[in-house]
Amino acid sequence: MAPLKFPPVNRYLITSALPYANGPIHIGHLAGAYLPADIYTRFLKFKGFDAIHICGTDEHGVAITLAAYKEGISPRQLVDKYHDRIKKDFELMGIEFDHFSRTTRKIHYETSQKFFLRLHEKGYFEKRKVKQFYSPQEGKFLPDRYIIGTCPYCGYEEARGDQCEKCGRQLEPTQLINPRSAISGSSLELRETVHWFFKLSSLKRELEEWLKDKDWKPFVKEFALSWVEEIEDRAITRDLDWGVPVPLEDPDAKGKVLYVWFDAPIGYISATIEYLPDRWEDYWKDPQAKIIHFIGKDNIVFHTVIWPAMLMAHGEYNLPYDVPANAFLNLMGRKLSTSRGYAIWADELVNSVGQDIARYAIALYIPEKDDTDFNVREAFERTNSELVDSFGNLAHRVLSFINANFGGRVPHPNSLTSEDEELLNYISEKVSNYERNLLNYNFRLAQKDAVELSNAINRYFEHRRPWKLVKENPDRAKTVLFLSYQALKIVSALFYPYVPNSVMKLWDYMNLPAGKFDDFVKVSPDLAGNTIKESKVLYRKVEEDKINEWVDILNKRAGNERISIEDFKKVKMVI
């Protein structure tokens, strides 16, 4: 059994990868970096620890300028538009950030430029003449993402100049076969220019020593170590007019900005400063604080090698404690594609099935180790079975029975039987497993623990037949309902990080006092006599017709025929 991965401190800085402000959020984003981080942070807070969840939109780089070009608007207009959209998407999904910032804010520019200057003063940068692709047709040097070509490693013909999306390898534009402009498709030529390089190779030994003892997900650690083996210095400036200006008087710095993957992770620091101007150092400089970065696997190299190297070079900040990266989420056997519109967007999913169903369904497919396929039919059928039929039904039958047979007051128990003790022992075992799994980032196993406990409590209730006991053995009926109420309280604590909105409604129906996780998962004798409220049904099933409609929608999108808003409006919205 894996050890409980829970550092002996009480201060945690949790971050989710900063989403590019160039489009809305889809289920792949949610499953990879945002829902797992939200579940994890909610649990830490429930445990009573000082934990903050920091995020914000990444608003620089060629991903932004390219998207703005395609939409026919300025980069500023684009990021303003999508910052608001992304923030709303997260709110709809119940993703709760303590602070959600932007990398175009003044505090971020100041923090990034100070960071750059410190590394510059310490000798970690070197100005080099390099040959870079120039587009005669467009009359300018092209940054890496403005260049596409064939990946030299896997042969993917649409690889970007910075990374191949298919095999995940980091690339330099000059490595591409048959490079061309991503905008015009025109051929390119190499010309000489100047850029500042981060001397990553000088930190190779430090990175290896730091990484070798890390108790991380195996695939994350292996990826990082393999990348460090072949580490090379990287240019951290770009020829762009959108971004954080290089803060040097050098004439060669004119018209250059910081590479987006240099300034973006500094956004974690600037957002924390913005949120807690008087306490931010408690999270970034106190060696007892733990920083945990939730990301997708395409960002592993940046968060496990380049970002730690930047922090090492700076010398004043904590290094990441853990980087629980997740793999990719596929959809109905196909790769998600925002450009082709093949995705399920956060807002349409919540508007269709509600926040709780959406969160639960996505959590079932968090790609913790390998790329995972989200099957919409299976997802909704499992959610119906596990969340609605098991947990939701348990809550309804226990509270309804107390209201109907005990005047809405939790009965006082009598002596426990061996069957009662067996249930309590099973509860204790499941709670321990759940906590261990969740804190080791095994979110799907923790979710399974919650469901299995819910099923066991349902069986206990069903087999005791309280509707007969209340007539034939009232004292025994009181004990069964007291224990059922207590068990419902306990299992609700396990479901809380996954479906917080509905669980908080349940706690209100149960008239439970505020408390921490450790309080919730214990039997509380003082709740005997507690007056509960009239309860309402927590969840509604996703009906077969709606499941079929979703399958049809995705089949159309898979055929590169993005469904129109008129077609989508035909889907019944029942929340």
Language-model features: locations:
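Basic, alpha-helical terminal appendages of large translation-related enzymes
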Residues: 1-11, 56, 128-137, 149-166, ...
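N-terminal, positively charged nucleic-acid-binding surface of large information/translation enzymes
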Residues: 2-209
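Structured secondary-structure scaffolds
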Residues: 3-55, 107-111, 177-404, 446-450, ...
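Alpha-helical scaffold segments in carbohydrate-active enzymes
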Residues: 111-118, 264-267, 390-401, 426, ...
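A glycine-rich phosphate-binding loop feature that marks nucleotide/adenosyl-phosphate handling sites
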Residues: 132-137, 325-328, 377-379, 411-418, ...
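Extended, non-catalytic structural segments that build the interaction scaffolds
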Residues: 145-157, 294, 374-387, 429-448
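Short, glycine- and charge-enriched coil/turn segments that flank and shape catalytic ligand pockets
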Residues: 213-214, 251-254, 276-287, 407-425, ...
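Active-site-proximal binding-pocket segments
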Residues: 300, 365, 369, 378, ...
